[in-house]
Regions:
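N-terminal redox-cofactor-binding region of secreted/periplasmic oxidoreductases
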Residues: 1-281
């Protein structure tokens, strides 16, 4: 959504979304997350492979299938990646991706109701505010954690991320502020922006070493679009590597096993996934 916003300032952009429009009232209301996590309309509702350490149970893995992606169905918590992760990306050769270098873009994208500071910005499209839901048990949990040796942290997006404390959320007043709300809705009427909902990308079309277009399915029809400049894959941590594999980019052995011609061998595609666990107490 953010890329569609920025790129359509000067370019013609086709935005493909496999899901539908974000019109469900459950998306707008924060407590609607309970309904969305069990939805099969706005949620891909994946299951993991059986986990040996969990008695071979499969763990439900919600992913957004709607405009705004997972930002339209998540718990609204605003916590950035750890600074050391970005620094690791830079060390691997991704120049420009250290935390110091990406922090200005985080600040530019947000309107933090705490005000402007070294780690927060104001005036941006994504509204971030304090979580208004507070119960006595919340404070009891914080106090118990401090007694157990954890430090109190009033800002997980500040100088330190470790510790215990209240988190901020992506809301405007008492409504969700998703990526679609922040970056897409304000520019939806641009003539050079085409948003195709219910358009599931089947593959990127590759010519030599370059992606030259996409093939997607919409309303039962298979459609091929040719890109005049470039193709950007923004399908999330699960379906971005899946889309690369469907396009012939990945481990040759795996692609051969699922009858996909390998156009570019790259063993790391679909590997090294890390995700956070959520435990409701």
């Amino acid at each position: 959504m953010c890329l569609a916003n920025r790129l359509s300032e000067n370019n013609r952009v086709l935005l493909l979304e496999a899901g539908g429009a974000d019109t469900s009232p459950f998306i707008k209301m924060p407590t609607g997350v309970i309904r969305l996590l069990s939805s099969r309309t706005e949620n891909w509702a994946f299951d993991t492979a059986p986990e040996p350490a969990l008695n071979n149970r499969k763990i439900n893995w919600p992913r957004g299938k709607v405009l705004g992606g997972s930002s339209s169905i998540n718990g609204l918590v605003y916590v950035r990646g750890h600074a050391q992760d970005y620094e690791r990306w830079r060390q691997l050769g991704n120049e420009g991706w250290s935390y110091e270098e990406v922090l200005p873009y985080f600040k530019r994208s947000m309107n933090n109701e705490r005000g402007e500071g070294p780690f927060h910005g104001i005036g941006g499209p994504l509204n971030v505010k304090e979580c208004e839901s507070s119960l006595p048990t919340h404070q009891h949990f914080i106090e118990a954690s401090i007694e157990a040796g954890y430090s109190f942290n009033p800002d997980f997006n500040g100088a330190e991320q470790e510790g215990v404390g209240p988190f901020q959320v992506t809301q405007v007043a008492r409504k969700r502020c998703s990526a679609a709300d922040a970056f897409l809705t304000p520019i939806i009427d641009r003539d050079n922006l085409n948003v195709a909902i219910l358009g599931r990308t089947l593959r990127n079309d590759i010519d030599g070493k370059k992606a030259v277009g996409v093939t997607y399915k919409q309303d039962g029809n298979q459609i091929q679009e040719v890109a005049s400049k470039e193709v950007l894959v923004c399908a999330g941590k699960v379906q971005s590597p899946q889309l690369l594999q469907l396009s012939g980019i990945g481990n040759p052995v795996h692609l051969n096993n699922v009858d996909v011609e390998c156009l570019h061998p790259l063993d790391g595609v679909g590997q090294n996934l890390q995700d956070h666990l959520n435990i409701v107490v």
